[in-house]
Amino acid sequence: MPNYTLYYFNGRGRAEICRMLMAAAGVQYTDKRFEFNEWDKYRNDMPSMCVPVLDIDGQNKMPETMAIARYLARENGYYGKNNMDMFRIDYICDCFYEILHDYMRYFHTKNGRFMQGSGTDMSPDMDPTQMTSYIQNRYLDTCRRILSFLERTLEMRNGGKEFFMGDQMMLCDMMCYCCLENPMLEDQTTFNNFPKLMSLWKRVASHPKITPYLKKRNNTNW
C-alpha cells in the first residue's frame, strides 16, 4: 500500500471527497492541513500552486481534486465495472463539482477571501457587495440547472431508491454528499424540490463505511 499524504486547508472544501474515499476504503493516510495564513509556506511545493494535492510515497505529487478522486476510486473499487459505468459516474461527478466550484467561490468571496478573478464578465470596478451578489446568483443558477438533471438521472436506476449506479455506493454518490453538505447547511430550501437527491445524501451519511468517518472527522465550518 502506498504512503499517502493529502495537502489541503483546514476545511472540508475540495478535499473532502478524497478524504471520504480513503475512509470508505480503509486507506491510511496523513491528513496535512494548514490555515490560510500558512499557505505561502506550501504554495511553491505544489505542482500547480493550488490544493488539494496527494503525495504518493514522497515521490509523486498529484494535483486537482477530481484527478485525485478518480485515482482513489479506481484503486479501491468505487469507479464502476466498465467504460460505460465510468462514463456515467464521470458526468454525475462533474455535475456535482460544478456546484461545489461555484459554491466555494461564493463562500470565500462573502468571507472576504476572493476579491478578484471570479468571472470574466465581471467589471473590475464592482464593489464587494455587488461581487458577492453576482457570485451567489451564479451559484444558485448552477444549482437550478444541475440539480433537476441529477434528480432525473438518479431516478433512472430503480426509481432513485438506491445509489446512482444501483445497490452499491460509488464515487458519484460520495460526491453528492461532499458537494452538497455546506450548501444544505447554509440553505436547505434550495434543495426542497429534489427529494430523491436528499434521500441519497442521507443514505451516504448512514452507510456503514461513511458514518464512522463523519463522527470522528475534524469539525470545520466549510
UniProtKB/Swiss-Prot annotation:
It holds the Pfam family GST_C_3. Lens. The keyword Transcription does not apply. It comes from the Eukaryota. GO terms for biological process: glutathione metabolic process. Keywords: Eye lens protein. GO terms for molecular function: glutathione transferase activity; structural constituent of eye lens. InterPro entries: Glutathione-S-Trfase_C-like (IPR010987), Glutathione-S-Trfase_C_sf (IPR036282), Glutathione_S-Trfase (IPR040079), Glutathione_S-Trfase_N (IPR004045), GST_C (IPR004046), GST_superfamily (IPR050213), S-crystallin (IPR003083), Thioredoxin-like_sf (IPR036249). Residues 82-222 form the GST C-terminal domain. The keyword ATP-binding does not apply. Residues 2-80 form the GST N-terminal domain. S-crystallins are structural components of squids and octopi eye lens. Contains relatively little if any GST activity. PANTHER family: GLUTATHIONE S-TRANSFERASE. Belongs to the GST superfamily. This is S-crystallin SL20-1. It comes from Nototodarus sloanii.
